[in-house]
Swiss-Prot record:
GO terms under cellular component: cytosol
Predominant place of localization: cytoplasm
InterPro entries in alphabetical order: Aldolase_TIM, DapA, DapA-like, Schiff_base-form_aldolases_AS, Schiff_base-form_aldolases_CS
Reactions performed catalytically: L-aspartate 4-semialdehyde + pyruvate = (2S,4S)-4-hydroxy-2,3,4,5-tetrahydrodipicolinate + H2O + H(+)
Cleavable signal peptide: none
Pathway: Amino-acid biosynthesis; L-lysine biosynthesis via DAP pathway; (S)-tetrahydrodipicolinate from L-aspartate: step 3/4
Name the record gives this protein: 4-hydroxy-tetrahydrodipicolinate synthase
Keyword Cytoplasm part of the UniProt annotation: yes
Length: 298
């Protein structure tokens, strides 16, 4: 298997709700907008998609919709399929593969605090259950669990279909260290604030929250960097500074969904508890920053 298979500009899709249910029509439109604006892959049912509060049926439906909309296009589907129960992560990975997803994004197990050996066995079981590409997802600020550099490298070398890691630890030194020890690995930025530093230090793509709103700019930034045109990439990165900052003024995905609502890209500003709408102050701040950007709606 070619380990370079899912890289480039990728969007961590929000999940729009309406009257307490997944708004499937808006969801489909959002994916089509991504396709039309140069995104290389979409990631349904991940952190930004509020996977923790989706039912199992809703989670699977989000994957199915993404696969159906992307069918026949160049845009790939990297399905969110993580769990802190290995058997459930395996079941999700199998479902995603059987229903046409191009790859799997699997977050580190949260809450139960596995050892590094436990993490290794968890991911090995997932990788052995499917023959599609698997991207590890390291986000210790949310999971309370750090996948060590040694564990990431061992999994990459031992499991043919584990092709890299989405790094959302905010630790640039770790990212540089990973590539120094295993330059074949596909390092993917998982934080919009450090997309440019990661791409300019050997990263091969981004999984972006901001690209829900500005897919064309994130695509351009990513591809300029991959083409080693760092001057143009940095120029776009600088233009995105204020929006990247405000989109994390509260817990993701609260600000990005708010911005999408303000832009008229989703019909209803709904969250699943314990997530809730932003404060009035932050709503106003998001609205003010957005005035500086030209958002292309439906």
């Amino acid at each position: 298997m070619d380990k370079n298979i899912i890289i480039g500009a990728m969007t961590a899709l929000i999940t729009p709700f309406k009257n307490g249910k997944v708004d499937e029509q808006s969801y489909a439109r959002l994916i089509k907008r991504q396709i039309e604006n140069g995104i290389d892959a979409v990631v349904p049912a991940g952190t930004t998609g509020e996977s923790a509060t989706l039912t199992h049926e809703e989670h699977r439906t989000c994957i199915e919709i993404a696969v159906e909309i992307c069918k026949g296009t160049k845009v790939k589907v990297l399905a969110g399929a993580g769990s802190n129960a290995t058997h459930e992560a395996v079941d999700l990975a199998k479902f995603a593969k059987e229903h046409g997803a191009d790859g799997i994004l699997s977050v580190a197990p949260y809450y139960n605090k596995p050892t590094q050996q436990g993490l290794y066995e968890h991911y090995k079981a997932i990788a052995q259950s499917v023959d599609t590409p698997v991207l590890l997802y390291n986000v210790p600020g949310r999971t309370g669990c750090e996948i060590s550099t040694d564990t990431i490298i061992k999994l990459f070398r031992d499991c043919e279909n584990i092709y890299g890691v989405k790094e959302a630890s905010g630790n640039i030194d770790k990212c540089v260290d990973l590539l120094a020890h295993e330059p074949r690995m596909m390092l993917i930025s998982g934080e919009d604030a450090i997309n440019y530093p990661i791409l300019s230090n050997g990263g091969k793509g981004v999984i972006s929250v901001t690209s829900n709103l500005l897919p064309d700019m994130i695509s351009a930034l990513t591809h300029f960097a991959l083409d080693e045109n760092y001057k143009e990439a940095k120029k776009i990165n600088d233009e995105l500074y204020n929006i990247n900052k405000i989109l994390f003024c509260e817990s993701n995905p609260i600000p990005i969904k708010t911005a999408m609502y303000i832009a008229g890209l989703i019909e209803s500003l709904e969250f699943r508890l314990p997530l809730c709408s932003p404060s009035k102050e932050n709503f106003a701040k998001i609205e003010e920053v957005m005035k500086k950007y030209k958002i292309k709606g439906f």
